[in-house]
């Protein structure tokens, strides 16, 4: 059982931060198949899991031949893949709201690169604009009654953000410019660059060329 997007509130859904990427995910193991669980029964895990892992896992359990183009890993069963120490994530267009974000996380720190930093987190997406909460937010923004943190949702983003989601679950303290996090930021930048080149990310092309 899983959701298809992050928190369904403004700033969550459709945004390239942990708040937008993270979804609930539950696996139920009947008595007959509980031996397939590497985590035990009735427990939770902080293992890094991606939607990319679902197809390889199901194909493996069904005894099928694994297509070479699949990128995920097998989560459970005899062919379970080793755990990963980081996940690479992406967020792009949502309906009429263009965007392009690439992210890497180790489970605690989340580094996101906003290629369209001129687009605010609360960018105009028609589907969301008809909701009452978004209308109230825009009205308060226009009336200048929001505090700086609240206003930031309607202002251009920083090109890079680095959040410690263990100590900052709402992702409001960007650590990217702090000297004590410079080494970590550099490692995450390099990892993301290498991943983008390895995967040959086609969404860097204009949409009309895809």
Spans of features found by a protein language model:
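Short, solvent-exposed turn/loop segments enriched in Gly/Ser/Thr/Pro and often Arg
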Residues: 3-9, 15, 191-210
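Active-site regions of oxyanion-processing enzymes, predominantly non-cytosolic
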Residues: 5-10, 18-20, 108-112, 163, ...
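Polar, surface-exposed loop/tail segments
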Residues: 42-106, 173, 181-186, 190, ...
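C-terminal, low-complexity/hydrophilic appendages and adjacent surface loops
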Residues: 18, 94-177, 206
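Histidine-centered active-site microenvironments of extracellular/periplasmic hydrolases
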Residues: 1-46, 50, 69, 96
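Short, solvent-exposed loop/turn and secondary-structure capping segments
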Residues: 10-15, 38, 60, 123-124, ...
